[in-house]
């Protein structure tokens, strides 16, 4: 973050009202770090995000007595167990699918979580997920919408397993133009159409595999598309706070946010190491080394930079594999310039390989 951006964030923070008691006016309670909260207006939220400040909007937690919990215990495999199955599934992943789906997502004026086109894009995505499930003929697979306290909804596809242990790959579906959130052009090709279509292609890969379906996965698999990430991880909080209250056994969550920009230097993934689960991160490295053709390096993105933070905050082990090291991220996001012309679909396909390997290896793991 530049010095000018830091000064802007400090100025905005100075006018925010700290504390759990709701002030007068239309204010939102945000968390900038563990236990560090401030009241801000919606306009201040947008300006803080534009200045590089990340946060979780926790307004809906007022009165719930939220308490952070220890992570759900998990036992991740130390070795690759299903290389033949995963390799055969990877061979059927399609760069053309990624291109077609991302082009369609980018054609909406924006996918802002409070706009009409944000709802229309979610409906379109829901139809694509339903189509994948219907065409697979997979028994028990389903998709459902999870409503939020705003217009756009979350989408969750489920492949039930023989245990209640759950493995998740997720991406946020919304986009934003920081200059004009509601009406501005925000194709959001990289942020985060790229992650959304990667998760969709991973779902195709899993459900399209006869070997996978015949193997009867041990653990339940879920594919998530979150609404309202750009407003402070809103949709993913809806999901993971509910999972926490329901006592769900989420053993692993892989976040795919930014998956199409190759960067300016050496092509490599960025493994987010802050506010993530270190044991799961090691498993992710093993998956990348086995199933992808590019290396992975450690990087940090700050508190609440994306939806894995909602899982982590609610006690669920989470990791994020990003398109590059954080400092080499796409400079065109959050604007009308976030278009497919800046993206590399071979790089995006590598993300799909990782997502597919992650879900298959953990889906088949026993005693997770």
Curated annotation (Swiss-Prot):
Q: What are the subcellular locations of this protein?
A: Secreted
Q: What is this protein called?
A: Probable leucine aminopeptidase ARB_03492
Q: Which cysteines are joined by disulfide bonds?
A: 301-305
Q: Which organism is it from?
A: Arthroderma benhamiae (strain ATCC MYA-4681 / CBS 112371) (Trichophyton mentagrophytes)
Which residues does UniProt assign to the signal peptide?
1-18
Q: Which purpose does this protein serve, as stated in its record? A: Probable extracellular aminopeptidase which contributes to pathogenicity.
What EC number(s) does its UniProt record assign? 3.4.11.-
Supply the alphabetized keyword list.
Aminopeptidase, Disulfide bond, Glycoprotein, Hydrolase, Metal-binding, Protease, Secreted, Signal, Virulence, Zinc
């Amino acid at each position: 973050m530049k010095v000018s951006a830091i000064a802007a964030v400090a100025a905005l923070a100075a006018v925010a009202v700290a504390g759990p008691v709701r002030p007068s006016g239309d204010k939102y309670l945000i968390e900038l770090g563990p236990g560090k909260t401030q009241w801000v207006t919606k306009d201040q939220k947008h300006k803080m995000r534009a200045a590089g400040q990340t946060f979780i909007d926790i307004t809906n937690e007022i009165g719930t007595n939220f308490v952070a919990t220890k992570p759900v215990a998990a036992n991740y495999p130390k070795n690759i167990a299903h290389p033949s199955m995963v390799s055969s599934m990877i061979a059927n992943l399609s760069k053309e699918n990624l291109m077609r789906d991302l082009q369609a997502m980018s054609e909406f004026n924006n996918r802002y979580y409070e706009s009409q086109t944000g709802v229309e894009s979610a409906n379109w995505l829901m139809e694509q997920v339903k189509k994948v499930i219907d065409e697979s003929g997979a028994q028990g697979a389903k998709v459902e919408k999870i409503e939020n306290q705003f217009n756009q909804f979350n989408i969750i596809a489920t492949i039930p397993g023989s245990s209640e242990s759950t493995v998740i790959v997720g991406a946020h579906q919304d986009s934003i133009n920081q200059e004009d959130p509601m009406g501005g052009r925000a194709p959001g090709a990289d942020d985060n159409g790229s992650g959304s279509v990667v998760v969709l292609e991973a779902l195709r890969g899993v459900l399209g595999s006869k070997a996978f379906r015949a193997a009867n996965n041990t653990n339940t698999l879920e594919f998530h598309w979150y609404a309202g990430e750009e407003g402070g991880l809103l949709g993913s909080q809806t999901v993971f706070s509910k999972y926490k209250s329901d006592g769900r056994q989420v053993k692993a969550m892989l976040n795919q946010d930014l998956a199409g920009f190759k960067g300016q230097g050496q092509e490599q993934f960025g493994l987010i190491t802050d506010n993530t689960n270190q044991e799961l991160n090691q498993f992710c490295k093993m998956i990348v080394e086995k199933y992808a053709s590019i290396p992975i390096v450690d990087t940090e993105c700050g508190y609440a930079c994306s939806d894995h933070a909602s899982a982590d905050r609610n006690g669920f082990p989470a990791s994020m594999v990003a398109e590059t090291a954080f400092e080499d991220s796409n400079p065109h996001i959050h604007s009308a310039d976030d278009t497919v012309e800046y993206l590399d679909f071979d790089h995006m396909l590598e993300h799909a390989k990782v997502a597919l390997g992650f879900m298959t290896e953990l889906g088949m793991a026993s005693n997770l």
